[in-house]
């Protein structure tokens, strides 16, 4: 009887994590579709008028007329740069490996940030050189938006698995979402085109979704 119960729990737990992995792969596919859509809009210059309208509106804000506010925005955007994200990912990897005693997850987290960022950066440069012949938006997708969506996206996806306290979970969840939105808004105000920011977000988000999805498919738990 107990043996049958144990078998039932084992059989039920595996599809649970597999369904989570499938959900993440599906979500990554949605971000991939949005990225392809943004590539098409930029490639055929449909995003140019939208970017110019947002750029002109951003220039009319008081942030561009104040050197202090501009400096604050630049410091905010550094929270999503690869120079900030890569060392921080090492700290998160050490935390997951030692404090949470999950070496596989810690190593996977660091490798995900490093490898996905390198892969997506290569794709970014390839697209930038291709689009440069057809569009004025040569900075597509934005590297900072890519880095912050990848790193903070991984943290957002790990929060439900690592933290059980619901209030703390909600605070961290919405704080990270707010930080992503704030850094993206700061990039736009500083003159980065909206299409470049959205393209970077989509690339980073699909990288985070596929990374955790692959991890769940391989290890079946976090």
What name fits each language-model region?
Residues 2-82, 125-132:
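N-terminal transmembrane-helix/juxtamembrane module of multi-pass inner/ER membrane proteins
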Residues 25-27, 104-112, 171-176, 196-200:
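Alpha-helical transmembrane segments of integral membrane proteins
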Residues 26-41, 89-95, 178-183:
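Hydrophobic core of alpha-helical transmembrane segments in multi-pass integral membrane proteins
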Residues 36, 114-122, 178-188:
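Aromatic-anchored segments of alpha-helical transmembrane domains
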Residues 75-86, 139-148:
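Structural signature of hydrophobic alpha-helical transmembrane segments
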Residues 89-116:
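Interfacial segments of alpha-helical transmembrane regions
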Residues 108-112, 116, 120, 200, ...:
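Alpha-helical transmembrane segments in multi-pass membrane proteins
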Residues 131-222:
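Membrane-embedded catalytic cores of phosphoryl/pyrophosphoryl-handling enzymes
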């Amino acid at each position: 009887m107990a043996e049958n119960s144990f078998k039932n729990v084992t059989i039920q737990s595996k599809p649970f994590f597999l369904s989570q992995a499938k959900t993440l792969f599906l979500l990554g596919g949605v971000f991939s579709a949005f990225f392809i859509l943004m590539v098409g809009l930029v490639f055929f210059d449909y995003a140019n008028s939208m970017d110019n309208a947002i750029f002109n509106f951003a220039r009319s804000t008081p942030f561009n007329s104040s050197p202090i506010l501009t400096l604050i925005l630049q410091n905010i955007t550094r929270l999503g740069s690869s120079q900030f994200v890569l060392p921080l990912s090492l700290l998160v990897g050490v935390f997951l490996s030692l404090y949470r005693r999950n070496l596989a997850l810690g190593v996977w987290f660091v490798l995900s940030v490093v490898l996905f960022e390198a892969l997506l950066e290569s794709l970014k440069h390839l697209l930038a050189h291709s689009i440069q012949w057809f569009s004025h938006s040569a900075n597509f997708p934005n590297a900072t938006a890519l880095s912050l969506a990848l790193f903070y996206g991984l943290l957002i996806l790990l929060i439900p698995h690592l933290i059980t306290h619901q209030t703390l979970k909600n605070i961290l969840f919405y704080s990270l979402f707010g930080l992503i939105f704030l850094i993206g808004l700061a990039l736009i105000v500083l003159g980065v085109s909206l299409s470049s920011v959205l393209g970077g977000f989509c690339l980073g988000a699909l990288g985070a979704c596929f990374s955790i999805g692959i991890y769940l498919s391989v290890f079946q738990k976090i």
